[in-house]
Structures are given as structure tokens and as C-alpha cells.
Amino acid sequence: MKYLLHDILKWSFSERKETAGMDVKIQRNQRMLAAFGMLGFAVGIVYANLMTRDYIGNIGIFNDFFLQQYGMVEIDMPDYLWYLGRIRILPVVLLAMLGYTRFRRVVVSAFLLWTGFSCGMIMTASVLQMGIQGLILCLIGMTPHMIFYIAGYLILIWYFYTYPVMRWNAQKTVSTILFLAIGLVLEAYVNPILMQGFLKTL
């Protein structure tokens, strides 16, 4: 009985120690992923501040003519959904293909750096060009579909970055496809309504 109790306590302590070690590793990975995104975002802010105002004005979403036309045009939702599907699926496919190579961590890090850089540059450029209205325009431009895109991408990113500890399964496949599909539908059918409603107030 004495030895049995000793073995149970030893096993319990060992399991807690292993669990604690896993928690530390998870937290470290989370911090690393967040750091890559934040670094890219900071570089994007700096880059946007170095651009000239004329150059910023020529960027598609900040061009006055583009904004006027977008606010008045009648969008064919099915065609727009098909267009979005083609341009949104490509990055997912590339990330998935490159993620299955031995450079998966480098791929994930580069993806987060580029995503953070793009967000930082666009949001800063919008403020420089249009003030607070530009920032609101950017936020509305990412609503509500971006939440689902982020959720779908995070499943892929977390899997590739923590492999082989994290394993892929049917649940992850279904969740990723579902999140991305919902994001596409919302971007095609809901976001244009929000964008046009806001542009009419400018």
C-alpha cells in the first residue's frame, strides 16, 4: 500500500510537471506568433509614414474616384462572391502547401510579418489621407468577415507552428472550411452594404 501510494503520487507529480511544461511551451508559441504580427504592424506604420501623400492618394481604396464609384455602383453579389473566392482561396492554398514543408515555421512567421505589415501600412495610410474617417473606413472594410477569416487562418497557423505536437484532424478541416466560407459570404453580401452606407456619409 505504501509503495502504491508512492507510485501514484510520483505519477501525479510527473503528470502535473509535464502539463505545466506544455502550458509554458504553448504560451511561448503564442507570444512568438503575436510578436511576428506586431513587428510587421510596426514596420507597416513606419513605411506608411515614409510614403508621400500623392502616393497614398493613388492607392485604390483611398482614391477619391474609386470611393465615389464604389459608393454608387450596384454590385452583382454572385459574381462578386465568385471573384472573392478566387482571390481569397489562393493565399490559403499557398499557406497550406508551404506549411507542409520543413520550412513551416519560417512560412508562418513570414505570413504573420506580411499580414501585420499590410495592416499597419493600410491603416496608417488611411489616417494620413482621410483622418479619423479613414480609420473608420478601414475598420468597416474588415467588418464582419475578417473575424471568420482570422479564425480560419489561426487554425492553420497554429497547427503548422506547433507541429508535430499538434495533429490535424477532421474537426480542424471542417472548422477551417466553415470559417473561411462564412467569411466569403459575409464579405460578398454584407460588407458592401456597410461600406456603401458609410461612403454616403462622407
What are these regions (language model features)?
Residues 70-96:
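Interfacial helix-start motif at the membrane-water boundary
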Residues 98-120, 170-181:
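Cytoplasmic juxtamembrane regions at transmembrane-helix boundaries
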Residues 49-69:
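Interfacial/capping segments of alpha-helical transmembrane domains
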Residues 153-202:
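Terminal transmembrane helical module of multi-pass membrane proteins
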Residues 114-144, 191-192:
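Hydrophobic alpha-helical transmembrane segments of integral membrane proteins
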Residues 40-44, 48, 91, 149-152, ...:
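Alpha-helical transmembrane segments of multipass membrane proteins
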Residues 24-56:
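N-terminal signal-anchor transmembrane alpha helix
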Residues 14-29, 71, 95:
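Cytosolic juxtamembrane amphipathic/interface segments immediately preceding
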